[in-house]
Amino acid sequence: MRQGLVPKKVFFTSGVGRHREMLESFEMALRDAGIEKFNLVTVSSILPPDCEIVQKSEGLPSLYPGEIVFTVMSRNSSNEPSRRIAASIGCAIPKDPVKNFGYLSEHHSYGETEQYAGMYAEKLAENMLFTWTKEKPGKTMNISKTAEVDDEGNWTTVISAAVFIL
């Protein structure tokens, strides 16, 4: 059976960046998350079967600067003073994660707390898994980042990401 590019590991990270330019605020968020050195390719929301969730500190050394790296990423930016922005990734892990795939969800919003945005993303992933399997997940989790735009209206970007390791 052909498996192609199926990730063996995944780690979660998030970051915030601020700059007068929108693109540079995104770069600063990538740096804060520790994933600025890679050519990131966003993919949709499947957590492969038998994909081990590892800590960022374990996953990052497995990647090489300039490497093409697949990620599920949530991103939000604003330059509206005092605007709160959020970016979250939810994860629903099936009861048998060795045999079955799970779901990852992206949620980006305005005005929500980090906790609320994270729980919302987690619930999205749980619902996506349930509509496919008709079973509740074995475990759910999320990673979120929120920030408030400064009074000067500098661009602020938040990201949350599930980063795959092949």
Curated annotation (Swiss-Prot):
Any Gene Ontology biological process: arginine catabolic process
Name the Pfam families on file: PvlArgDC
Q: What class of enzyme is it?
A: lyase
Q: Which domain of life is it from?
A: Archaea
Q: Which reaction equation describes what this protein catalyses?
A: L-arginine + H(+) = agmatine + CO2
As to how many cofactors bind and how, the note says: Binds 1 pyruvoyl group covalently per subunit.
Keyword Transcription found: no
Q: Which GO terms describe its molecular function?
A: arginine decarboxylase activity
Q: Is Lyase there in the keyword field?
A: yes
Sorted alphabetically, the keyword list is:
Decarboxylase, Lyase, Pyruvate
Protein family membership:
Belongs to the PdaD family.
- Name this protein carries in UniProt: Pyruvoyl-dependent arginine decarboxylase
Organism, by scientific name, is Methanocella arvoryzae (strain DSM 22066 / NBRC 105507 / MRE50)
- Lineage, opening ranks: Archaea, Methanobacteriati, Methanobacteriota, Stenosarchaea group, Methanomicrobia
